[in-house]
Regions:
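Conserved nucleotide-sugar phosphate-binding/catalytic loop shared by glycosyltransferases and other
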Residues: 38-82, 155-156, 161-163
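Donor-nucleotide binding loops and adjacent catalytic segments primarily
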Residues: 3, 216-324
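Conserved nucleotide-sugar donor-binding subdomain of glycosyltransferases
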Residues: 69-120, 161-205
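C-terminal amphipathic helix plus adjacent low-complexity
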Residues: 376-436
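A donor-sugar binding/catalytic signature common to diverse glycosyltransferases
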Residues: 110-113, 311-359
Length: 436
C-alpha cells in the first residue's frame, strides 16, 4: 500500500468491544496509515490518550457508574438483555449513528464495522465507501455446525447431534423472531436493497469479514460467510493507562499464586454478591485472592489476610501470575485468560459469554459455573477440580503457546491492506450501488 490511507473503525460497547479496534488502529498507525476510532463519546479520553484519532458516534450511553443501576441490570439480564439493548438503545439511535458516521467517512478510504453497530453497513453501502465487517466472537456467526450456546439455553451445546440441517432450521426460526424493524425501515428509506437481517447476515460485508478471534478458539465452519478471514485475537491492554500498583507487586511477590476474580468492564456493575462469595471460596480452597472490583461500590466490607482488592489492573501483567482466573466470559477477558496460560472458571452472565465459556471448556482449559449457581461451596468445588487435575494447567499452557505465535492486529492490518490495494487497482470491483 503506497500512500497513507484514512481508515474509519466504527465500534460500540464495552472495553471488550473497544480494545480490539484500538489494537488494530495502533498497528495501522504504525504502518503509516491514519486510523480513526469512531465510537461513543465516553471513550474519547481513552482513545485520544492512546495517540489515536477519535470521532464521536451516537448513541451516547453514559459511563456505567453514572447510569441507573436498573438500566444495567436490564441490559445484563440473560434472556431479555440483548433484545432490550438492541431494541431499546441501539436501533432507535440508528439515524443519529448514521448521520455521525456519514460525516466521519467523508474522504475515507475504508470503513471497518462492528456487529452491534448497524449504521456502519448502511453508510458503507449508501456512500460506496469500501467496507470490511468484523465479528469478535464465534457466537456472531450463528453456525449450524457449531451451534451457539445462549445463557438461558445451555442445552443447545448438545444440539449438534441432530446434524446441521435440523440445527440450521431451528436457528432460522430463532433468527426470524428477532426483527430489526427500525433499521430495515431506515434501510428502505435510503433506497438500499434488502441484504438480510441487520443483526445476522445483514451485518456482513460482501467484500471481507474479519473474525477477530483465533482458530485455536473456534475453527472456521462451512456456513460462515465465504469471504471470512480469521485474523486472531487483537490484544490491547492499556499499560499507559494503568500502572501495576506497587501494593499488588508486593502481594504477588510474598506468596503463592492467587486466584484472580474479575468481571470485566460490564458484568462488574451487576456483581451483587460475586466478590463476597469469591472471598469465601478462596478461603475454602486455601488460596490467596486478587479481586478486580471495578468500582468502590463493590469493595467488600472487610478483606481477610491473603486477599487484595483493586479497581482494575492490566490483564497482561496480572493474569499469568494467577493459579486460576475466574471471570464472566466476555470474549476480551476469555482471550486474555487463554493467552495467560492458566486454567479458568467462567461464570457467564449474558450475551455471548456462555458460548465463549463452551469454546474454552472444549479446549480443556476451563470449567463453567452459571451465575445463578455462584455460591462459595460450588465455586470452591470447581476451583478444586481445576487445581487438582493437571490436565487443565497443561492444556492452558499449550493453548497459550499457540496464541503467542499469532499476531491478531498485524494479521488484521495485512487483510485490511489487501482490500485497500484491491480498491486502488480496481475500484469498480468494490463499489456498491448508492441507491441514488
Amino acid at each position: 500500500v503506497h500512500k497513507p490511507k484514512r481508515i474509519i473503525l466504527n465500534t460500540f460497547g464495552s472495553f471488550g468491544d473497544i480494545h480490539p479496534y484500538m489494537a488494530i488502529a495502533m498497528e495501522l498507525q504504525r504502518r503509516g496509515h491514519v486510523p480513526v476510532v469512531a465510537t461513543m463519546e465516553i471513550y474519547r479520553e481513552k482513545i485520544e490518550g492512546a495517540g489515536l484519532e477519535f470521532v464521536a458516534v451516537r448513541p451516547n450511553i453514559p459511563q456505567p457508574k453514572e447510569q441507573d443501576p436498573e438500566l444495567i441490570e436490564k441490559i445484563m439480564e440473560p434472556k431479555t438483555g440483548p433484545r432490550f439493548l438492541t431494541e431499546g438503545l441501539i436501533f432507535p439511535a440508528v439515524r443519529d449513528s448514521y448521520a455521525d458516521l456519514l460525516k466521519a467517512v467523508a474522504g475515507a478510504d475504508l470503513l471497518v464495522t462492528h456487529p452491534a453497530a448497524p449504521a456502519g453497513p448502511l453508510v458503507g453501502r449508501k456512500t460506496g465507501t469500501p467496507w470490511i465487517s468484523t465479528v469478535l466472537a464465534p457466537f456472531s456467526f450463528i453456525s449450524a455446525y457449531d451451534p451457539p450456546v445462549p445463557p438461558y439455553w445451555q442445552w443447545t451445546r448438545r444440539l449438534s447431534v441432530l446434524g446441521p440441517g435440523v440445527v440450521g432450521f431451528l436457528l432460522g426460526m430463532m433468527k426470524s423472531s428477532h426483527k430489526a424493524k427500525v433499521v430495515t425501515e431506515f434501510r428502505d428509506e435510503l433506497g438500499l436493497d434488502d441484504n438480510g437481517n441487520p443483526m445476522f447476515e445483514g451485518q456482513h460485508s460482501p467484500t471481507r469479514v474479519l473474525a477477530l478471534f483465533s482458530e485455536v478458539f473456534a475453527k472456521p465452519q462451512p456456513d460462515w460467510p465465504p469471504q471470512t478471514e480469521v485474523a486472531g485475537f487483537c490484544f490491547y491492554d492499556g499499560h499507559h493507562e494503568t500502572e501495576v500498583p506497587p501494593e499488588l507487586s508486593r502481594f504477588l511477590e510474598k506468596g503463592a499464586p492467587p486466584v484472580v476474580f474479575t468481571l470485566g468492564s460490564s458484568a462488574v456493575w451487576v456483581a451483587r454478591d460475586f466478590f463476597r462469595e469469591s472471598i469465601e471460596a478462596a478461603r475454602r480452597v486455601g488460596r490467596r485472592a486478587v479481586l478486580l472490583i471495578g468500582d468502590e461500590r463493590n469493595m467488600p466490607s472487610s478483606l481477610p489476610e491473603g486477599v487484595i482488592a483493586l479497581d482494575y489492573v492490566p490483564y497482561l501483567s496480572l493474569l499469568p501470575e494467577a493459579c486460576v482466573v475466574v471471570h464472566h466470559g466476555g470474549v476480551g477477558t476469555t482471550s486474555q485468560g487463554l493467552f495467560a496460560g492458566v486454567p479458568t472458571l467462567i461464570v457467564p452472565f449474558a450475551f455471548d459469554q456462555s458460548d465463549n465459556a463452551e469454546h474454552a471448556r472444549k479446549l480443556g482449559t476451563s470449567r463453567t459455573l452459571y451465575r445463578k449457581d455462584y455460591f462459595a461451596p460450588r465455586v470452591a468445588n470447581e476451583l478444586t477440580e481445576l487445581l487438582r487435575q493437571p490436565s487443565y494447567a497443561r492444556r492452558a499452557i499449550e493453548v497459550s503457546q499457540k496464541l503467542k505465535r499469532e499476531d491478531g492486529p498485524a494479521r488484521a492490518a495485512d487483510l485490511i491492506e489487501q482490500i485497500l490495494t484491491r480498491t486502488r487497482n480496481s475500484p469498480e470491483e468494490l463499489a456498491y450501488a448508492s441507491g441514488d
